């Protein structure tokens, strides 16, 4: 059986983590890389023995005949890159978010549908061993769940220290809060029935955002974000019998009813050796390519998370 071939678009830190994850799977080869910054692409190609550095994105498929392409470009380039990659018969794995904002995500989704492209999104926290552990335990009970998601964002740091483009920072709830808001769609059952802002987003004075989300299952989500103030990235899931907490997100711990002791759950070795979630995500991408059951979110699935962000922030 021939090797599964993977191509990479982009040459930043995320590209590097994807290369490591795919290259670790037996029978998978990273065969080409393309980036607007050729020197970075060449450096990664040298480090990971990638045989081809492609100058023009339009030549990437014909030069590599890759089975999978991983798109790790800056959000501002996502629309143009998506318009090109969906033309080819490979499986597309997009880094999140797929678009600068909800409207652009809709546009990209329409481009993919028009080409009948196979598109998935790297919402890697869905593949954390902590997330999998919590979901497996919750599946054993039909008790109602209260999911609290705690978000913290620093747009000033993103703009001035991390040198993110101003337009990206203006849409920072899509660019970065997607990491946290997607947890509602993973941990809550059923469909969203209502999104009720309790403390409204103020774009002129980014501070506190609190929103209640009701699901058809009876599950309730509470989103609390602090902007330009200290706070954790954390998730809790409370049922009558047990409370789960992920703080940090890579570590799940639980507390049983009637006790005060917090018990940590084991963390999978893959989440220590690779960027958390990436190794399993790569495996799931291979399954999607092979037509096997898999846990990758589709482009349309991620669009629902983008829509939830829009509703929470009333934008």
Model-derived features with residue positions:
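C-terminal helix-rich "cap/oligomerization" subdomain common to oxidoreductases
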Residues: 1, 68-73, 117, 216, ...
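Rossmann-fold dehydrogenase core element
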Residues: 107-124, 142-147
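Active-site loop of classical SDR/Rossmann-like NAD(P)-dependent oxidoreductases
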Residues: 269-283
């Amino acid at each position: 059986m021939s090797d599964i071939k993977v191509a990479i678009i982009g040459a930043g830190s995320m590209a590097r983590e994807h290369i490591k994850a795919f290259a670790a799977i037996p029978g998978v080869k990273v065969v080409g890389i393309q980036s607007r910054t050729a020197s970075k692409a060449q450096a990664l190609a040298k480090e990971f023995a990638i045989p081809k550095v492609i100058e023009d994105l339009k030549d990437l498929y014909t030069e590599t005949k890759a089975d999978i392409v991983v798109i790790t470009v800056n959000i501002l380039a996502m629309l143009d890159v998506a318009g090109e990659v969906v033309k080819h018969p490979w499986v597309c794995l997009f880094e999140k978010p797929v678009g600068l904002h909800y409207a652009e995500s809709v546009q990209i989704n329409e481009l993919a549908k028009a080409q009948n492209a196979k598109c998935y999104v790297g919402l890697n926290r869905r593949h954390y061993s902590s997330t999998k552990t919590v979901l497996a335990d919750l599946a054993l009970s039909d008790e109602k769940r209260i999911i609290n998601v705690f978000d913290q964002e620093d747009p000033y740091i993103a703009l001035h220290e991390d040198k993110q483009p101003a337009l990206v920072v203006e849409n920072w709830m899509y660019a970065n809060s997607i990491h946290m808001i997607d947890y509602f769609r993973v941990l809550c059952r059923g469909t969203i029935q209502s999104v009720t802002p309790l403390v409204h987003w103020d774009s002129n004075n980014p501070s506190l955002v609190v929103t209640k989300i009701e699901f058809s299952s009876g599950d309730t989500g509470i989103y609390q974000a602090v902007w330009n103030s200290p706070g954790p990235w954390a998730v809790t899931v409370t049922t009558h019998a047990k409370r789960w907490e992920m703080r940090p997100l890579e570590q799940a711990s639980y507390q049983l009813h009637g006790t005060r002791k917090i018990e940590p759950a084991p963390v999978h070795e893959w989440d220590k050796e690779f960027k958390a979630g990436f190794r399993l995500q790569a495996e799931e991408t291979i399954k999607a390519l092979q037509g096997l059951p898999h846990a990758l979110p589709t482009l349309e699935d991620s669009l629902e998370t983008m829509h939830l962000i829009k509703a929470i922030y009333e934008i």
